[in-house]
């Protein structure tokens, strides 16, 4: 019997919804990355995008352990000389909590074209409501 290899045209992708309230950032992100890759399906194939769509609500209420709120910094560069900027995790959660989960999950996905396709399937909202009710997302236990 031959090994089953999933083809792109027969891959079925479902929508799942997760509540980030009181979830630990790293453990929560690994679960999301695994579902985006498609590892929770029996038809997982590494080179095909078989992952599901993921909706995250309540990103503002995610839990950070230890002293990371004060000691963890995110850096970016404007492109100008002396243009390095840094922001603490505490300020990032206050200003743009969606970006914290986005960066955490993106770091756990493949670093190529397949990873760029997978990260587009992650939809993050800071509040309770989202605009994907039409897709009828299923709630998975985490």
From Swiss-Prot:
The keyword Cell membrane does not apply. One of its GO terms (biological process) is translation. Keywords: Ribonucleoprotein, Ribosomal protein. SUPFAM superfamilies: Ribosomal protein L13. InterPro entries: Ribosomal_uL13 (IPR005822), Ribosomal_uL13_bac-type (IPR005823), Ribosomal_uL13_CS (IPR023563), Ribosomal_uL13_sf (IPR036899). This protein is one of the early assembly proteins of the 50S ribosomal subunit, although it is not seen to bind rRNA by itself. It is important during the early stages of 50S assembly. Belongs to the universal ribosomal protein uL13 family. This is Large ribosomal subunit protein uL13. It comes from Wigglesworthia glossinidia brevipalpis. The gene is rplM.
